[in-house]
């Protein structure tokens, strides 16, 4: 019986300085990846977020995917990165009435997932007013995320809710509570150690947030931070565009070796659960930000992505988690000579 393994992927735009499709795909193919998550890309008419792609651009990307041997792991859409309430709070976050958002943006993300033949959409848990307690807005966030999960479910898709600063679901505990209340098979959670560390959590606290998220886990973003941030208030507002200490998974305080060793024991059951929804397995999606990151993305460059991937593979080897990078047999299969 084959050993359960993880599927390696990356936010492709992080591997490219100019975000062109060829640059992104060349870097990932050279690193041996077979999957990528699609966020921002230039197909010849300037850099666009995935949500803005035209059908002609989608078709061009699909042809390039075939050429470079890549498949989409997830649509890395900014779904849920808008305000819950139409209230001025000193941020630049947009507000969109939810009925309109569900009918337009969420529907568009579902269409994109089908166009790129993936079952996964990455998203977020909405911004409460800047200085409010996120707990005070759980009810509305749960209601809206439940409707998003149902929209994805009706399209045979799964919505992954990422933990991130400043959102309602800014901690593992809060995301776990959202997941419990929504209670929908199309909603899973996306763990990200750096997104917790940068809010002032200690390594021991990051482990507790991981444990809270495990029952709802769908996949993991691989990003680490050099040291806990002194924020004054754990879980308080974070100026995301000023964060500067992102590091590979073998250099940070996120405890990835312990977390991934724990994930190893979850892989058989979690893989089966995801496969029942048409998802090929458990993704580890590299989003290293090693050249910098902010609210709507980050950059690593082709060399930085390579450094981050090698760091992750070293951690996986120590944690005894199986994975696969393209090898000569894959090349022969692509040539049609096997």
Task: Show the residue positions of the predicted features.
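Histidine-acidic metal/acid-base catalytic patches
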Residues: 2-9, 17-34, 66, 172-338
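N-terminal substrate-binding region of glycoside hydrolase catalytic domains
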Residues: 11-13, 27, 31-55, 76
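Short beta-strand segments at enzyme active-site cores
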Residues: 37-38, 72-77, 118-125, 158-162, ...
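Surface-exposed, active-site-proximal loop segments in enzymatic domains
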Residues: 42-56, 79-103, 125-137, 235-247, ...
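Alpha-helix-loop-beta-strand connector modules within alpha/beta enzyme cores
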Residues: 55-77, 142-155, 181-182, 254-261
């Amino acid at each position: 019986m084959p050993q359960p393994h993880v599927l390696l992927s990356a936010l492709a735009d992080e591997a490219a300085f100019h975000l062109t499709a060829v640059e992104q795909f060349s870097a990932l193919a050279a690193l041996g990846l077979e999957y990528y998550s699609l966020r921002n890309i230039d197909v010849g008419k300037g850099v666009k977020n995935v949500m803005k792609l035209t059908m002609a651009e989608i078709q061009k990307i699909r042809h390039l995917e075939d050429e470079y041997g890549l498949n989409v792991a997830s649509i890395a859409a900014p779904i849920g990165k808008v305000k819950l309430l139409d209230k001025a709070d000193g941020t630049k976050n947009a507000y969109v009435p939810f009925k309109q958002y569900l009918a337009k943006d969420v529907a568009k993300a579902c269409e994109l997932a089908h166009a790129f033949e993936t079952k996964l959409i990455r998203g977020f848990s909405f911004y409460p007013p800047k200085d409010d307690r996120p707990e005070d807005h759980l009810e509305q966030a749960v209601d809206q995320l439940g409707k998003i999960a149902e929209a994805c479910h009706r399209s045979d898709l799964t919505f992954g809710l990422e933990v991130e600063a400043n959102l309602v679901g800014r901690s593992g505990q809060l995301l776990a509570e959202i997941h419990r209340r929504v209670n929908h098979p199309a909603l899973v959670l996306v763990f990200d150690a750096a997104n917790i560390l940068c809010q002032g959590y200690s390594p021991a606290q990051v482990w507790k947030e991981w444990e809270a998220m495990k029952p709802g886990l769908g996949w993991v973003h691989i990003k680490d931070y050099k040291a806990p941030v002194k924020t004054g208030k754990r879980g308080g507002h974070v100026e995301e565009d000023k964060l500067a200490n992102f590091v590979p998974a073998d250099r940070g305080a996120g405890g990835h070796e312990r977390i991934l060793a724990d994930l190893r024991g979850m892989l058989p059951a979690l893989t089966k659960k995801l496969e029942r929804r048409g998802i090929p397995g458990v993704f580890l999606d590299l989003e290293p930000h090693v050249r910098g990151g902010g609210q709507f993305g980050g950059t690593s460059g082709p060399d930085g992505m390579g450094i981050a991937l090698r760091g992750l593979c070293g951690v996986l080897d120590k944690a005894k988690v199986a994975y696969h990078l393209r090898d000569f047999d894959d090349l022969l299969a692509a040539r049609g000579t096997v």
